[in-house]
Swiss-Prot record:
Belongs to the complex I 30 kDa subunit family. Keywords: Chloroplast, Membrane, NAD, NADP, Plastid, Plastoquinone, Quinone, Thylakoid, Translocase, Transport. This is NAD(P)H-quinone oxidoreductase subunit J, chloroplastic. It comes from Lemna minor (Common duckweed). NDH shuttles electrons from NAD(P)H:plastoquinone, via FMN and iron-sulfur (Fe-S) centers, to quinones in the photosynthetic chain and possibly in a chloroplast respiratory chain. The immediate electron acceptor for the enzyme in this species is believed to be plastoquinone. Couples the redox reaction to proton translocation, and thus conserves the redox energy in a proton gradient. One of its GO terms (molecular function) is NADH dehydrogenase (ubiquinone) activity.
Length: 158
């Protein structure tokens, strides 16, 4: 069994890997970072015009980082949305993923948060900078190998 998007990608010989279905029947697809920008545009044109969420996670200490996208396509009415989950895995030493800001504007703050917490750089993002942590913060706080500083002084906290 495949989602409509997965079947379309297979038909057009676009490389991806199915990671299975979740409990709601939503398929998760693994896409290579170098293919993500073109597959994002194809997904949008195919009808996945709503980016429900973008997030990131650390797969394992010293392992890969993942950028995750939940896309929705409403073709047969709002009570029957078709959803797909896209995962892009990148090495932690040089975590670069093409930004999808230019496809889904709602990716703006979400990609910035993933950058701020995990250090994933979103190539061609127009304003990629910290959004939650101070600009002076060192490190990526949600990585599993992050060492919490013993003390951090907040300047001008008034």
């Amino acid at each position: 069994m495949q989602s409509h998007l997965s079947a379309w990608l297979v038909k057009h010989e676009l490389v991806h890997r199915s990671l299975g279905f979740d409990y709601q029947g939503i398929e998760t697809l693994q896409i290579k970072p170098e293919d993500w920008d073109s597959i994002a545009v194809i997904s949008y044109v195919y009808g996945y015009n709503y980016l429900r969420s973008q997030c990131a996670y650390d797969v394992a200490p010293g392992g890969f980082l993942a950028s995750v996208y939940h896309l929705t396509r409403i073709q047969y009415g709002v009570d029957q949305p078709e959803e797909v989950c896209i995962k892009v895995f990148v090495p932690r030493e040089n975590p670069i993923v093409p930004s999808v800001f230019w496809v889904w504007r709602s990716a703006d703050f979400q990609e910035r948060e993933s950058y701020d917490m995990f250090g994933i750089s979103y190539d061609n993002h127009p304003r990629l900078k910290r959004i939650l942590m101070p600009e002076s913060w060192i490190g990526w706080p949600l990585r599993k190998d992050y060492i919490t500083p013993n003390f951090y002084e907040i300047q001008d906290a008034h």
